[in-house]
């Protein structure tokens, strides 16, 4: 099952071993080479709280309200300008999504990910259109390049009945 990566922002980070609420997810980080989620950043709950990140391999489970990690030992404190690995979803949002033959499909609004292996399964474009993708077929740089036949695979949002 695929979930919007942006839906993870704002949920609690909880350590199972210590039974502690560590903070709330502030960002999802994606490796542009592998096209997989690699980490989650969070801030402590105090005003002006410190920034930390958790590598995805240390995440036990993601629920509707909680990102569960085994222990606080997995947490990396971001100090002196240190950043989590990969690129943040926020940095990727708004990028132009273009086919290899130059057709502009829209701007990246979100990414659908699989919790099973943390891979990108679909790109969500402006207008809530979805483009199912294979990670090997997309390129992420200053923009997102997708195969030439991608325009024909765009899924329009379902009409809402009133």
Where are the predicted features?
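Peripheral interaction segments used for macromolecular assembly
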Residues: 1-162
């Amino acid at each position: 099952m695929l979930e919007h990566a942006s839906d993870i922002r704002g949920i609690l980070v909880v350590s199972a071993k210590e039974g502690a609420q560590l903070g709330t997810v502030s960002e999802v980080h994606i490796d542009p080479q592998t096209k997989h989620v690699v980490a989650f950043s969070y801030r402590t709950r105090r005003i002006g709280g410190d920034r930390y990140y958790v590598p995805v391999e240390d995440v036990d489970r993601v629920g509707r309200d909680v990102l569960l990690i085994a222990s606080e030992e997995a947490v990396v404190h971001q100090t002196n300008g240190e950043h989590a690995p990969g690129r943040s979803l926020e940095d990727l949002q708004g990028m132009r999504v273009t086919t290899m033959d130059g057709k502009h499909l829209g701007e990246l609004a979100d990414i659908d990910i699989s919790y099973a292996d943390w891979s990108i399964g679909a790109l969500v474009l402006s207008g809530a259109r979805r483009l199912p993708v294979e990670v090997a077929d997309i390129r992420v740089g200053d923009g997102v390049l997708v195969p030439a036949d991608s325009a024909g695979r765009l899924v329009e949002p379902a009409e809402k009945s009133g």
